[in-house]
């Protein structure tokens, strides 16, 4: 059986992140209190949208950063174990995950996957699986 040393939990701004963190805590306890880190990857309009858009991207990013900070504050109240690191990535999800997993010796990543039509189009699970060479726990959300 693999002994995990550093678990990365990919969170979003939804309450579903709490269940991912709970799973990470459970797995960490089974593996001699493996370190747990969190990552949020911001893939907003400025990075993902290629067409014409008539909005002020800086305002969207500012609101999104405020949402992220609020989410992280709420998570601190929920989490009863030490969080090793918190990462906020921007842009391509696969690149951000690859960078963090290599630099910080992550050996397990936990993330959720929504089972709806749009998520199948937007979220490229295959690209992540083919790029990251570590164990993954994919938790389906319905």
From Swiss-Prot:
Q: Which family does it belong to?
A: Belongs to the universal stress protein A family.
This protein's record includes keyword Cytoplasm: yes
Subunit (UniProt): Homodimer.
- Name the chain's protein: Universal stress protein A
* Record-linked Pfam families: Usp
Q: Name one GO cellular component term.
A: cytoplasm
Q: What job does this protein perform?
A: Required for resistance to DNA-damaging agents.
Stored InterPro entries: Rossmann-like_a/b/a_fold (IPR014729), Universal_stress_UspA (IPR006015), UspA (IPR006016)
Compartments where located: Cytoplasm
Q: What is its main location?
A: cytoplasm
Membrane-crossing segments per the record? none
The answer to whether the entry has keyword Cytoplasm is yes
* The entry's keywords: Cytoplasm
Q: Organism classification, top ranks?
A: Bacteria, Pseudomonadati, Pseudomonadota, Gammaproteobacteria, Enterobacterales
């Amino acid at each position: 059986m693999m002994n995990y040393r550093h678990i990365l939990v990919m969170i979003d701004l939804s309450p579903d992140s709490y269940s991912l963190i709970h799973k990470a805590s459970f797995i960490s306890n089974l593996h001699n209190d493996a370190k747990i880190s969190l990552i949020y990857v911001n893939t907003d309009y400025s990075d993902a949208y290629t067409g014409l858009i008539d909005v002020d991207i800086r305002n969207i990013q500012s609101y999104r950063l405020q949402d992220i900070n609020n989410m992280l504050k709420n998570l601190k109240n929920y989490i009863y174990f030490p969080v090793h690191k918190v990462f906020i990535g921007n842009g391509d999800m696969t690149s951000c995950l690859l960078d963090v997993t290599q630099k910080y010796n992550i050996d397990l990543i936990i993330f959720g996957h929504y089972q709806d039509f749009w998520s199948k189009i937007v979220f490229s699970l295959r690209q992540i699986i083919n790029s990251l060479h570590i164990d993954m726990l994919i938790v389906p959300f319905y």
